[in-house]
């Protein structure tokens, strides 16, 4: 049987060695393989080499890959493709299958690495450790051209077996090296007696280790020292506490801390957090509360209950004696005002006094009895009422001096007659007596300005410097004026309690400042209640004021309309018209404007609750321009705008503009002005004429007589009530020329010429006793007096002027 097999083997070998006479080409082979695959004879995938001349199965490719890995331990996939001669794509795909099915292999960055390779590396590392005691994982990773994490992951399961070392902070250390460093850490830690940060301890240890290892030594990471320290602490080879992983407090220091705190607290009954910080205790409140459960934590100190009892006794005495106490004065200097305030709230006597409203805490540390505060407040309240009244009345107009100035040019004999006549013809009298030249006519305004210059120079400078700036409303100023300022309140408190002056007014924490802040709202409420009461009382007075103002304006405004009509006669003579317009604005118009502005100002003050004396509402007031402007600004809203327009018109040159603004202001104020109709005009003219006739009949001053005669002639001839100043008398006489006969006109012109001459002599006179002009003045006056009867006959005699 064996012989037969050997024979068959020889025949098969011969058949293989015999060269066939018919050979298949490469193309025929490829087509044959494809045909076999189509027929299903070959039912598995075939891969061809990169040369295309050989076929290889996937299983054979995996076997080739496994063989290379077993031989080399670590092989690159790219190198496998070159070695096996198969396309890289197929090699990568089969390599992944190989690694997936073999847990001992890993595919890392295009390389297949076996566990046997790592075992050999571990043995090499162990040999190197025996030489240098420590190796950095990063150094190994650089040599192996892999990541440090991979090296660390493969070394960790081999530590203590293949690798006789300890891995700490990316470093491999031998057991002997670890023991040596452990001894260093133990010795250094036991030598610390105060709280320390361990990171500061590791720096000198690193230097010591490097000096021990020489130039070949590698720097030791702090984490290695820290892990050794943590292990020693866990094994209780060191006593103390570790906080936040790095802050080490030895037990000896903690014991000394507690003894020091106990000693200070038992002696003083308090301990400050600052001293706790100096002792190295950062969380002082928690430490003290855990050690002294009966104590009380404050803002800056921790106290024993005996401190509260001591303060309670002192404050109780102050409250019972109707006095005050600064709690900080009985407490140590380390206590703050917040500490004092919290202690006061814990005092039983203070709690009961606050509940019964017998005491008050001001500024956190001051305790004042209610009786003490009331005594001071009652006195200040009385003075605050006086201050409010004085401040509210300070802005009212005092017209006495103004009235005397404005009436200087009215002769004494104009006071004769009834009060009713005075009221009707006040403006007429003021105008008709002005038979003086231009210089004398302007004497009154100039003197008023001169008197005001010295009195208001400083305020004028302030107004000039602030021109164009935004003004604070007068109403707000008046409201603020009646409220006493803080300085005033503090001064009154010092007057009542002189000892408060030692604290000073500038110190924001002084009892003086706190007491003033406490009393200020009370004073404001008191003053508001007073103003409310005054406002209620002012309601009837306001109605009476408006009624009186209406009556005054009714007659005055009708007279103003009457005088305005006479101006139409001089529209063709512009120079004279300007003089007449200005004269009427400065006399009658100024009087009724001042009456209205003053009345509205008083009404506004009453409306705002300001107490106004009864006499102030009845006085006749004549104001200057600045006072009118101040009163106008003192009004509210649109009323103020219209009042300012009235003041501006009064300073202008046209009476008609003034009349428009006056009507607007009166209408805005709720006042009704009567319009001059024919009937009223006849009545007023008749009364005016009658009054002038009476004055002409009784006039003894030759200078004043001329103006009254001219005015009476205008009524008789033109049926107009003319108000003419001295410098317009000549123009008025010229206007009468065509209406008078020659003798009457000559009488007027001669008398007017003599009057001007007399006034010129009087103006040039020095006033000395031996002045030679005195005789000339006397002679000229006697001449005028002799012509007075003839002048009167023009309006009173039998020969009346002829009307055309």
UniProtKB/Swiss-Prot annotation:
Residues where N-acetylmethionine is found: 1
Ranges annotated as biased composition (Low complexity): 400-409
GO BP annotations listed: protein ufmylation
EC number: 2.3.2.-
Enzyme class, first EC level, given as a word: transferase
Gene Ontology terms for molecular function: UFM1 ligase activity
Origin: domain of life: Eukaryota
Compositionally biased spans, kind Basic and acidic residues: 463-475
Record keywords, A-Z: Acetylation, Transferase, Ubl conjugation pathway
Region Disordered, annotated ranges: 397-483
Family classification: Belongs to the UFL1 family.
Function summary: E3 UFM1-protein ligase that mediates ufmylation of target proteins.
Name of the molecule in the record: E3 UFM1-protein ligase 1 homolog
Species this chain originates from: Arabidopsis thaliana (Mouse-ear cress)
